[in-house]
């Protein structure tokens, strides 16, 4: 009987540890996303936006959680040089949604995170009467497991983004040398 109780306790602890959060759910603790991140995968239904020289091909360095907003420090490659970009995204009236102006008007949500390893974003960009989707997978380390990458790919498909439009940045020039 003691062994059975111990097994139940262990399974409960494993379940609690493996629990994921999203900004659409009630269990997101946004404070826990504060800190250093690396861009791992980018996906879009407009692939040219995330290819080399695409306006949305940015590489995250840090997320700062502010009172009613999130501040992002990104890098991008312009004329073969790494350039810093600082963006502040404000909470919208919709629960779990943020907005920021960059190459158009963007709204985004956090689809999934486990805080310690990865975070997945879904963004909708509106510019000049046109819309496109962007999805991002960030990791706390420069690369992530194939299981997490597959989970991201399935989420992309659920949002109508084909696998051919997912770019793995783990071997790309992500301006790592420009990080502090």
Swiss-Prot record:
Q: Name one GO biological process term.
A: locomotor rhythm
Picking any one GO molecular function of the record gives:
small molecule binding
Q: Which InterPro entries match?
A: Calycin, Lipocalin, Lipocalin_CS, Lipocln_cytosolic_FA-bd_dom, Maj_urinary
Query: Signal peptide location in the record?
Result: 1-18
List the record's Gene Ontology CC terms alphabetically: cytosol; extracellular space; nucleus
Q: What is its main location?
A: secreted
Question: Which compartments is it annotated to reside in?
Answer: Secreted
Keyword terms of this UniProt record: Behavior, Disulfide bond, Pheromone-binding, Secreted, Signal, Transport
Give coiled-coil spans as residue ranges.
none
The answer, when asked if Secreted is one of the entry's keywords, is yes
One Pfam family, short name please? Lipocalin
TM ranges: none
Please give the positions of the paired cysteines in each disulfide bond. Answer: 82-175
Functional note? Major urinary proteins (Mups) bind pheromones, and thus stabilize them to allow slow release into the air from urine marks. May protect pheromones from oxidation. May also act as pheromones themselves. In this context, they play a role in the regulation of social behaviors, such as aggression, mating, pup-suckling, territory establishment and dominance.
* Family according to the record: Belongs to the calycin superfamily. Lipocalin family.
Name-wise, this protein is Major urinary protein 5
| Organism for this UniProt entry | Mus musculus (Mouse)
